[in-house]
Design a protein with these regions (language model features):
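A short beta-strand/loop micro-motif in the catalytic core of glycosyltransferases
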Residues: 99-100, 120
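Extended, subdomain-level signal for the structured scaffold at the beginning of enzyme domains
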Residues: 1-99, 106-111
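Alpha-helix capping/helix-boundary segments
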Residues: 105-106, 126
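A conserved active-site-flanking secondary-structure segment within enzyme catalytic domains
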Residues: 115-129
Length: 129
C-alpha cells in the first residue's frame, strides 16, 4: 500500500511528521509492504512552519500510485489558489482508495471539491461543506 503525504510551504510540521512516524512504525512492525512518502508540487526542498526544511520523496510528476493520500494543515492560503494543486488533489481523489486530511488540510480538500456534504469541527469551530 502506498501512503502519500502532501506537503507544501508553511505546512504544519506535526501534521506531516506525525502521520509519517505512525505509518512508518506500523510498516516496521507489521506492514512490510507499505510505502510511506512525502509529495510536494516540485522536488525542491519545502520550508514548513518554523523554518523546518524537508525534502519530498516525490513531486506531482514522478510519484507512484497513491492508495492513501494525506493532505496536511498549515498556512494553506497560497495552496488554495493554485489551480495545479487543486487539480492534482482532485485527480488523486479519483484514483486513491482514501483521501484524508489532518486539521486544516480539509480546506484544501473542500476547495478541490473532494468533499461531499459534511459538517466539520476542526479547532472548535463549525464549518458546513
Amino acid at each position: 500500500m502506498n501512503i502519500g503525504i502532501y506537503i507544501y510551504e508553511n505546512a504544519e510540521v506535526l501534521d506531516f511528521s506525525g502521520p509519517f512516524e505512525v505509518f512508518s512504525t506500523a510498516k516496521r512492525l507489521h506492514a512490510k509492504d507499505w510505502d510511506i512518502f512525502l509529495i510536494a508540487e516540485t522536488s525542491a526542498p519545502v520550508t514548513a512552519r518554523g523554518g523546518f526544511q524537508v525534502l519530498p520523496h516525490y513531486s506531482f510528476n514522478d510519484h507512484p500510485h497513491i492508495d492513501v493520500l494525506i493532505v496536511v494543515g498549515g498556512i494553506h492560503t497560497e495552496e488554495m489558489n493554485k489551480a495545479e494543486v487543486l487539480a492534482w488533489i482532485k485527480h488523486v481523489d479519483t484514483t486513491a482508495t482514501h483521501v484524508v486530511s489532518v486539521c486544516t488540510g480539509v480546506f484544501l480538500l473542500a476547495k478541490a471539491s473532494c468533499l461531499l456534504s459534511c459538517l466539520l469541527r476542526p479547532i472548535g469551530k463549525t464549518f458546513q461543506f
